[in-house]
Design a protein with these regions (language model features):
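Internal amphipathic alpha-helical segments of the cytochrome P450 catalytic fold
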Residues: 23, 130, 151, 171-172
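Short secondary-structure transition/capping segments
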Residues: 62-65, 99, 143-145, 177-178
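His/Asp/Glu-enriched, well-ordered alpha-helical/loop segment
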Residues: 77-158, 162-163
Length: 185
């Protein structure tokens, strides 16, 4: 089977090449479960895999059935280091749905708020500790993209990209590169 062009099986192309496994960073691996399971193999070899944040049209998923939470838990049970997992969205990217005949039935734009809503869901619905939930959006992708420690952490010399949150993780202030971009929610 192929994982975004990388064959994953008993004898992978990764084992036959000098290309470092960290070079491969497949995204949207939760678009189907078979792809997700194959991607776990890549993560165990040292690659980083990315799940797409869920669409939260009304804030949190009310019934608590957030599929990303289940997939992260499945990856943990499979022995995947959580440092090998990232979460992202196609914020402001277009999406489309087709019927069984390939006809376009719906199209739209992904909400940039999905990542923040996903963070809240991980903590409030999934029981993730805030520091671990944040790592899927901050330090993990920064390390995978070799931007750490300039990005993905709070440290001297880092860019000072911060979210200040209140109760129930209500967003209060956004700081980017040390400049306040939004204040008082």
């Amino acid at each position: 089977r192929e994982l975004d062009g990388v064959v994953i099986n008993e004898k992978t192309k990764l084992e036959e090449t000098e290309i470092p496994v960290k070079t491969f960073q497949p995204t949207h691996v939760n678009r189907n479960h078979e792809l997700f399971l194959d991607s776990l193999k890549l993560a165990k070899l040292g690659g980083t895999i990315d799940l797409t944040c869920e669409d939260f049209p009304h804030g949190l998923i009310e019934d608590g059935k957030d599929p990303v939470i289940g997939l992260l838990e499945e990856a943990r049970r499979a022995g995947v280091p959580m440092e090998r997992m990232t979460l992202s969205s196609d914020g402001q990217g277009s999406w489309s749905n087709y019927d069984e005949y390939g006809n376009l039935v719906e199209m739209g734009v992904t909400d940039v708020g999905n990542m923040y809503a996903q963070l809240r869901s991980l903590v409030l619905n999934g029981g993730f500790v805030l520091s671990e939930a944040l790592s899927f959006f901050t330090s993990n992708p920064a390390k995978a993209l070799e931007l750490f420690p300039k990005k993905g952490c709070i440290a001297p010399g880092a860019d000072a990209d911060l979210l200040l949150m209140g109760e129930a993780l209500a967003l209060d202030t956004v700081i980017a590169r040390g400049r306040v971009m939004m204040e008082a929610g």
